[in-house]
Amino acid sequence: MTGTGKTVTRVDLCEAVYKKVGLSRTESSAFVELVLKEITDCLEKGETVKLSSFGSFMVRKKGQRIGRNPKTGTEVPISPRRVMVFKPSAILKQRINSNGAGGKTD
């Protein structure tokens, strides 16, 4: 995976695990799906997922507020909801910024 600005998909992650770890394609796919499911399950429960040297995923509550319809200018109530937030680690920020917009090409 290189810093070409492309979007990395599940298939790309599975292929990277297959090539770098040595698992079969089926095992690599199952591994990636298991990790993503575990992260999803934790976030659904409102838990923070902290991955060292990468960052943290967390769920935050947003209260009800008044918004505006941009076309009409009419006030519209926005319901309370939960949003997922990602906060990159200092190490990840440094790697991204020290290698330009393209990132590291390992």
UniProtKB/Swiss-Prot annotation:
Keyword terms, alphabetized: DNA recombination, DNA-binding, Transcription, Transcription regulation, Translation regulation
Pfam families, per the entry: Bac_DNA_binding
GO biological-process terms attached to the record: DNA recombination; positive regulation of metabolic process; regulation of DNA-templated transcription; regulation of translation
SUPFAM superfamilies the record matches: IHF-like DNA-binding proteins (SSF47729)
Record PROSITE patterns: HISTONE_LIKE
Domain of life: Bacteria
GO MF terms held by the record: DNA binding; structural constituent of chromatin
Keyword Magnesium found: no
The keyword Transcription regulation is annotated on this UniProt entry: yes
One cellular component term from this protein's GO annotations in UniProt: cytosol
Function: This protein is one of the two subunits of integration host factor, a specific DNA-binding protein that functions in genetic recombination as well as in transcriptional and translational control.
Assembly description: Heterodimer of an alpha and a beta chain.
Similarity annotation: Belongs to the bacterial histone-like protein family.
Name recorded for this polypeptide: Integration host factor subunit alpha
Gene it is expressed from: ihfA
